């Protein structure tokens, strides 16, 4: 069963290292994606005065292509937009356009209040 959990230890860093991913992140919080207790993905969020800043999203290659990256991204955005007016991405990528982000300087940004997630039951559009 899938679940997402914020973590503050170094387990996400170890996971990424074992996956061959090298990144220099600023201090923040990792959000881990687990399937049946095994970490299969991670996102890293740093914090500015007025924004949560997504610095990276990773899903193990064997589990890509089925929407898990979207799931992890949306769960991370949901967790960190409740108390800050902005959610930013530290780099530019067309991937984030579908979430409503706009390019700004070297990254992308969206107003937290503008984030909505469509549901399959029609509750949100």
Each predicted region: which residue ranges?
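Short amphipathic alpha-helix that is part of the acyltransferase structural core
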Residues: 1-25, 32-34, 119-125
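Conserved acetyl-CoA-binding loop-helix of GNAT-fold acetyltransferases
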Residues: 59, 65-78
């Amino acid at each position: 069963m899938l679940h997402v959990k914020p973590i503050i230890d170094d387990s996400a860093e170890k996971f990424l290292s074992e996956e061959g991913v090298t990144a220099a992140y600023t201090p923040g919080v990792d959000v881990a994606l687990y399937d049946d207790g095994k970490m299969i993905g991670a996102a890293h969020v740093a914090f500015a005065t007025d924004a949560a800043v997504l610095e990276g999203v990773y899903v193990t290659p064997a589990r890509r292509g089925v929407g898990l990256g979207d799931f992890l991204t949306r769960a991370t955005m949901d967790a960190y937009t409740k108390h800050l007016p902005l959610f930013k991405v530290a780099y530019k990528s067309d991937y984030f356009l579908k979430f409503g982000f706009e390019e700004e300087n070297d990254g992308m940004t969206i107003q937290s209040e503008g984030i909505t997630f469509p549901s399959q039951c029609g509750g949100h559009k």
